[in-house]
Design a protein with these regions (language model features):
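A structural signal for well-ordered alpha-helices, especially hydrophobic packing surfaces
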Residues: 63-70, 74-77, 109-112, 116-119, ...
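General helical structural elements
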Residues: 9-10, 38, 153
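Immediate post-signal-peptide N-terminus of mature secreted/exported proteins
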Residues: 23-92, 175-179
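C-terminal amphipathic alpha-helix
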Residues: 45-48, 52-55, 59, 66, ...
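Short E/K-rich amphipathic alpha-helical oligomerization segments
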Residues: 79-92, 120-142
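Bacterial Sec-dependent N-terminal signal peptides
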Residues: 1-27
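Mature extracytoplasmic domains of secretory-pathway proteins
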Residues: 93-125
């Protein structure tokens, strides 16, 4: 009976691990899709409204940083589980250090703060631009506001994923004697 309990427990652990890996790979795929969308974002032309132009420039800079973080995070993830991007086990891969992970976590935290600021700026800019009635300026304004909304939404989702992923990697490294 004792051996049977161990076998059942072990099988649940194996099934749980497989489920977590599958879910993580699915999340990584979604992250990759967001990453590609972020890379395709094009900063709109100047609108001559300083607050809106400043917002679009800041959104662009935040998008560049997010696009720089995503491949680094994916690399850390694959190194932490000892696999290549294709899912092939690789025993020669060097596990990431806790310092590497903490450095990336700091960058991700900074991104979180930037996105919170961008979100508050967006609401201010939206209120400010809603009073403009000049039909010649409206298309540029709408284009810039839509760009900011789309980008902030993508960046928000990606940053939440990045924060959770780095937290899990750090947790795995520090509790699993993987250092």
């Amino acid at each position: 009976i004792f051996i049977m309990k161990k076998i059942i427990t072990l099988s649940f652990i194996v099934l749980g691990t497989m489920f977590v890996n599958a879910q993580t790979k699915e999340e990584i795929q979604k992250s990759q899709e967001r990453y590609e969308k972020i890379l395709k974002l094009e900063t709109p032309k100047s609108t001559s409204i300083s607050s809106l132009d400043e917002l679009t420039v800041n959104v662009g800079a935040t998008a560049v940083e997010s696009a720089n973080i995503t491949p680094l995070l994916q690399n850390l993830y694959y190194r932490s589980i000892g696999e290549t991007k294709d899912g092939v086990s690789d025993v020669t891969v060097k596990k990431p250090s806790l310092d590497e992970c903490k450095e990336l976590a700091t960058r991700i935290l900074s991104q979180t703060e930037k996105i919170q600021n961008l979100t508050s700026l967006l609401s201010n800019v939206t209120n400010e631009t809603s009073n403009i009635k000049n039909p010649l300026k409206l298309p540029k304004i709408l284009s810039s506001v839509n760009y900011a909304k789309t980008a902030i939404s993508l960046l928000g989702e990606e940053t939440v994923f990045q924060a959770n992923a780095i937290k899990n990697i750090i947790s795995t490294l520090s509790t699993g004697n993987n250092l």
